[in-house]
Amino acid sequence: MAWALLLLSLLTQGTGSWAQSALTQPRSVSGSPGQSVTISCTGTSSDVGGYNYVSWYQQHPGKAPKLMIYDVSKRPSGVPDRFSGSKSGNTASLTISGLQAEDEADYYCCSYAGSYTFH
């Protein structure tokens, strides 16, 4: 039985004003247990394409966001290697291999955009 991995856009505030642009993610991605899914995060050459500072967060309802990937493809200690990150041009991707029930969550991407601003 398939379930949806719900995705929301991550809007961040930078240098005292709302960031001019936001990264684009699909509204939802679905998969069945054991399958692999890839979540895309499209930006511009000013953020995703210009820096290798893309991070991914997982958030379950009522819980704080958890860092899953940083610097495009690095995993913090304790994050299963089922989670992997990559980047091509202005698009970053999070791939979850061997989906498990606990992977159902919101996933957010974030990218450095220069001048201490994040999208």
From Swiss-Prot:
Task: Please report the stretch or stretches of sequence annotated as the Ig-like domain.
Answer: 20-119
Alphabetized, the UniProt keywords read: Adaptive immunity, Cell membrane, Disulfide bond, Immunity, Immunoglobulin, Immunoglobulin domain, Membrane, Pyrrolidone carboxylic acid, Secreted, Signal
Localization terms from the record: Secreted; Cell membrane
The molecular function terms in GO held by this entry are: antigen binding
Q: Where is this region: Complementarity-determining-2?
A: 71-73
Q: Which residues does the annotated region (Complementarity-determining-1) include?
A: 45-53
Region labeled Complementarity-determining-3 — which residues?
110-119
Name the job this protein performs: V region of the variable domain of immunoglobulin light chains that participates in the antigen recognition. Immunoglobulins, also known as antibodies, are membrane-bound or secreted glycoproteins produced by B lymphocytes. In the recognition phase of humoral immunity, the membrane-bound immunoglobulins serve as receptors which, upon binding of a specific antigen, trigger the clonal expansion and differentiation of B lymphocytes into immunoglobulins-secreting plasma cells.
Annotated region Framework-2: the residues are 54-70
The ranges of region (Framework-1) come to: 20-44
Q: What is this protein called?
A: Immunoglobulin lambda variable 2-11
Q: Which GO terms describe its cellular component?
A: extracellular region; immunoglobulin complex; plasma membrane
Origin, by domain of life? Eukaryota
Q: Name one GO biological process term.
A: immune response
Residue numbers spanned by region Framework-3: 74-109
| Self-association and partners | Immunoglobulins are composed of two identical heavy chains and two identical light chains; disulfide-linked.
Signal peptide coordinates: 1-19
Q: Disulfide bonds, which pairs?
A: 41-109
